[in-house]
Amino acid sequence: MPVTDSIADYITRIRNAGRAKNKTTDIPYSKLRENISQLLQDKGYIKNFTVITTEKFPFIRIELKYTASGEPSIKEITRVSRPGRRTYEGKDIKKYLGGLGLYILSSSKGVITDKEAREQGVGGEILFRIY
């Protein structure tokens, strides 16, 4: 069955793997998903990711990060903009949870956080929020 919303699929796989306490999860490859994974790694939400190419199709293997008590480092991850209802923000993006969480945006500068968007003075489509 084809996936109509690849970002929602990405988010759901990470959320489910965290709840199941899995060390890794595999996600079908796309350049956008790779860019999002790089951003999440840079911000400390995931431990590592690797792009793996097989004979059939490439995929991204994400190593999840957990706290010392064994809880996932991603407490909440929620899709904001959906195929049926796109959500865009200008350069005056509000902070998520007073700056504790992040909005992840797709902008003309690539995949960036809400803080980076405010610093660069750009807006874009809010893909999801993470805390």
UniProtKB/Swiss-Prot annotation:
InterPro entries: Ribosomal_uS8, Ribosomal_uS8_CS, Ribosomal_uS8_sf. The keyword RNA-binding applies. GO terms for biological process: translation. One of its GO terms (cellular component) is ribosome. GO terms for molecular function: rRNA binding; structural constituent of ribosome. The keyword Ribonucleoprotein applies. It comes from the Bacteria. Keywords: Ribonucleoprotein, Ribosomal protein, RNA-binding, rRNA-binding. It holds the Pfam family Ribosomal_S8. Belongs to the universal ribosomal protein uS8 family. One of the primary rRNA binding proteins, it binds directly to 16S rRNA central domain where it helps coordinate assembly of the platform of the 30S subunit. Part of the 30S ribosomal subunit. Contacts proteins S5 and S12. This is Small ribosomal subunit protein uS8. The gene is rpsH.
